[in-house]
Swiss-Prot record:
A molecular-function term among this protein's GO annotations: 4 iron, 4 sulfur cluster binding
Protein's UniProt keywords contain 4Fe-4S: yes
EC number, UniProt record: 1.17.7.4
InterPro entries: LytB/IspH
List of residues binding (2E)-4-hydroxy-3-methylbut-2-enyl diphosphate: H41, H74, H124, T167, S225, S226, N227, S269
Binding site for [4Fe-4S] cluster: C12, C96, C197
Protein name (record): 4-hydroxy-3-methylbut-2-enyl diphosphate reductase
Gene: ispH
Binding site for dimethylallyl diphosphate: H41, H74, H124, S225, S226, N227, S269
Similarity comment: family membership: Belongs to the IspH family.
Disulfide bonds: none
Pathway linked to the protein: Isoprenoid biosynthesis; dimethylallyl diphosphate biosynthesis; dimethylallyl diphosphate from (2E)-4-hydroxy-3-methylbutenyl diphosphate: step 1/1; Isoprenoid biosynthesis; isopentenyl diphosphate biosynthesis via DXP pathway; isopentenyl diphosphate from 1-deoxy-D-xylulose 5-phosphate: step 6/6
Length: 314
């Protein structure tokens, strides 16, 4: 049996930055550091930070007045920001800059009173934060998840209408939704290209390349990770069975029956240490060769907030 590793895989620049912000805040200010929502959607990462003194909460009312709080990579609504200010919380913002870019598009639409349509998954924290940038009662923001949702939209005129997307969606599904939007509202405005981020795009392309060559694709990522779920869906859609798992303990030997080539990739919030532990487990189960696909090189880097950078330099 052979493993082929996808490339690129695992951590993206936004996840790297978010984790660094929590680590540096702990190093400089000491525990506890409060984090609103899991800083990234990965159980291994979150548990590691929790052991070092990070306290993960879902709402700010769980954070004592004046404490340090970090906003997760998924971003937060304006209401959450205002509450943090009112409560005199010291905030470090780990929102991915590519999510912030979408927030700015929504805020611009809100200021102009332009109606906005967000393509995204209902209930996902990124979607909640992005929807929460719109506060103009004269306009409105509407969420669609799929082509079927567009039929339910009853907006009167499309001359003052714009769309944006969650950053971690399926490229293929999103293209279909955008096409349907443009058919229904020919004058709708939107970003020059969709808002799906470079890391999501690159990892989906890598899975395409992988699925063509493999009998099974293993995606390392947590069940609540949007981008990891999309990777597993993509492989399945291409006709290659895919399994989404948290770590090596989840590998089921039964999956490997009649399998010669196993593809392994990781979502943008899954660290390489988990990939290597899965590779080790698969070697125990009979894998004797490991190859790596050549893929596009990623050199994106996002700085941490200045206050954490100054201390880092010392």
């Amino acid at each position: 049996m052979k493993i082929i590793l996808a490339n690129p895989r695992g951590f993206c620049a936004g996840v790297d930055r978010a984790i660094s912000i929590v680590e540096l805040a702990l190093e400089i200010h000491g525990a506890p550091i409060y984090v609103r929502h899991e800083v990234v959607h990965n159980r291994f990462v979150v548990n590691g930070l929790r052991e070092r003194g990070a306290v993960f909460v879902e709402e700010l009312d769980e954070v004592p007045d004046g404490a340090i709080v970090i906003f997760s990579a998924h971003g937060v609504s304006q209401a959450v920001r205002q509450e943090a200010k009112r409560r005199n919380l010291k905030v470090f913002d780990a929102t991915c800059p590519l999510v912030t870019k979408v927030h700015m598009q929504v805020a611009r639409a809100s200021r102009k009173g332009t109606k906005a349509i967000l393509i995204g998954h209902e209930g996902h924290p990124e979607v909640q934060g992005t929807m929460g940038q719109y506060d103009n009662r004269d306009g409105g923001i509407f969420l669609v998840e799929n082509v079927e949702d567009i039929a339910k939209l009853h907006l009167r005129d499309d001359d003052d209408l714009t769309f944006m997307t969650q950053t971690t969606l399926s490229i293929d599904d999103t293209a279909d939704v955008i096409e349907a939007l443009k058919q229904k509202y020919p004058n709708i405005q939107g970003p020059r290209k969709n808002d799906i981020c470079y890391a999501t795009t690159n990892r989906q392309q890598a899975v395409r390349d992988l699925a063509e060559q493999c009998d099974l694709v293993i995606v390392i990522g947590s069940k609540n990770s949007s981008n990891s779920n999309r990777l597993a869906e993509l492989a399945n859609r291409m006709g290659t069975p895919a399994k989404l798992l948290d770590d090596a303990n989840d590998v089921d030997p039964a999956w490997l029956e009649n399998v010669d080539i196993i593809g392994v990739t990781a979502g943008a919030s899954a660290p390489e240490v988990l990939v290597q532990s899965v590779v080790s487990r698969l070697k125990e189960l009979g894998v004797d060769t490991v190859e790596e696909l050549t893929g596009c090189e990623e050199n994106m880097f996002f700085e941490v907030p200045k206050e954490l950078r100054i201390n880092e330099a010392h």
